[in-house]
Amino acid sequence: MSIIISHQSAIELLRTDYVYQIIANTSKGTFRHPPLIPNRPPHLSEKRELWKTLHEILGSKPQLPIHVSITSNNGVYQTKGLQIHILNEKIPKTAFFEILPNLYLTKPEYIPIQMSRSCSILELALLASKLMGTYYIDQEGELKSRESPLITRKKLERFLRKHSDVPGCAKVWSALALSCEKAASPMEVKLFIRATLPCSKGGYGLGEMRLNQEYKVKKLTSQTKAFAIRKPDLVFETPKASRDKQPWKAITLEYNGQYHTTVEQQIADGIRHNELVSAGIKNYQVDKEIYYDFNCMQNLVVCIRKDIGLPERKLSHEEQIRYRKRQQDLVKLLDSIDPARWGSNVKQENHR
């Protein structure tokens, strides 16, 4: 019998190199799809074999319960170690692909729709950004990088348009409006959301931006004329009306996490920063302490707004107090989202 792994368990498997290589090495249209969607959950012997298989793929025990999807709820009961989901009849077999004989997985573009019932819009935005990013968190909790994302925004949007009548699509569209592509870490995603959300939602309203855009710069450590490619975390979009007045080629913002605390990395970061500045790129940097310092972040945003030609925001004392509360609430909300258990800590928020 075929088994379809879905929801949280599918997300867990998508971060493995085994599944990533299947996606990366499979040409468009050549995925193997289930011949039939199963209409019953796995029996006890099948469940034991499934647990063993997932353990081998993950390299550790799978999170319980294991989420599986079927087509019918006739006589279906929840059983220990499994979470049974009933598939919407409008979802085609092509939303799943084979990872082993008779074992199928939800495709990345369908994951946000599956998770839409249990996730808030903001949580879905982080999930979509993760699927469209070049990072993943391994089983030991370590941040790792990949050459390319599991899915592009274009592909996800195409799936949503094609299946617009499936419940959850509208919610995912709302989340997609808050999400980003090409993020290299979870903190880049959070910084992006804080920077781009409107001020009424606790963000800084800094407009559109790109992540990890490549810039060719002169290597300052080279004795010969050599160049290097640098990719700042966030690149701000300068309004057309301000571009002629802009002395800088670009305004960028970077997050320096724990990896950047060693002496060797700080030296490399200093050289990299100077290379960007020498190439005409104004490069702001924040670390964990600055990220959580609301006064420092607000003052930094004032500078960035001026650099990219956005008007200064003038607030009364009472408005400033209310705005600061919204900023704090947003940061708390972002921190409350558990990337290992999507939908486990749903908060009510209005970021539509």
Which functions belong to the PLM regions below?
Residues M1-P167, K325-R352:
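Short gly/ser-rich loop at a beta-strand->alpha-helix junction or flexible surface loop bordering the NTP-binding
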Residues E147-R352:
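Surface segments flanking catalytic/ligand-binding clefts of nucleic-acid enzymes
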